[in-house]
């Protein structure tokens, strides 16, 4: 008898109760998140003195960041507070996990404190899935980045940014450049782009930093930066994930910049109205030139701004769905 696979992110009725990965989400579901985020962007842009809505009033959101973060943790905190939630940021270094307590014991203890939602960043791929399997039916889990695996809210805010500036996904060429091998953002972006109907997704980087199987995901692979940038509409730059590298995969940061750094001259090979994106943190002079990062085609700070609205949308949507 064949066992039916059930997406652990979804309720029995197919609604989103956790956000663990973009993989497995339908085009309609991603579009619904982006449309909802658009409403929150409008709220932030309005003249209202109070930017809050009562969607999560009375709910407790626990931010559990087992890896360092600035943008993601801060924007999740702002998003939860704008939804009127009570927010607790757990200091992992001062918590019992630093004393040997297991991840699930930590989650069980926090659940006993009436947690309604966990936002989790962890170095181990799959950690948010493990948590989602063990929480009570009314508790929701959002993956804020797990190992090399996925960073779904970054992928969604990247899609929101692209849609904002380019409108239609179905006539775009998008290039992702850099350390794709170690990048959870790249994986999430690729799944989102292909699901939303982008006809050509390119991966550009040295052989040592590109994973196998990209072609099977519908991605065109380029090892030559200039060739890969020709005629693209969107350039997504990635930093070198030195903390996840083992062994000498690159000769030096300077050599990397010579071969794969995004300079104004290289950007000129893309379409004239191409936009430049970066999930941060940026390493200027390594993967991107300051003239590009701060230039007129850069939408990097827009990504950060849109990230709040996208995370508000995700939290609001999952909070309304459960198997109870």
Curated annotation (Swiss-Prot):
EC category: transferase
Binding annotation for carbamoyl phosphate: 71-72, 121, 151, 154, 280-281
E.C. number: 2.1.3.2
Pathway(s) where this gene product acts: Pyrimidine metabolism; UMP biosynthesis via de novo pathway; (S)-dihydroorotate from bicarbonate: step 2/3
GO terms for MF: amino acid binding; aspartate carbamoyltransferase activity
GO biological process, one term: 'de novo' pyrimidine nucleobase biosynthetic process
Catalytic activity: carbamoyl phosphate + L-aspartate = N-carbamoyl-L-aspartate + phosphate + H(+)
Any single GO CC term annotated in Swiss-Prot or TrEMBL for this entry: cytosol
Pfam families the record matches: OTCace, OTCace_N
Keyword Lyase: no
Coiled coil: none
Record's function text: Catalyzes the condensation of carbamoyl phosphate and aspartate to form carbamoyl aspartate and inorganic phosphate, the committed step in the de novo pyrimidine nucleotide biosynthesis pathway.
Subunit-structure text: Heterododecamer (2C3:3R2) of six catalytic PyrB chains organized as two trimers (C3), and six regulatory PyrI chains organized as three dimers (R2).
Family: Belongs to the aspartate/ornithine carbamoyltransferase superfamily. ATCase family.
Stated name of the protein: Aspartate carbamoyltransferase catalytic subunit
Organism field: Cupriavidus necator (strain ATCC 17699 / DSM 428 / KCTC 22496 / NCIMB 10442 / H16 / Stanier 337)
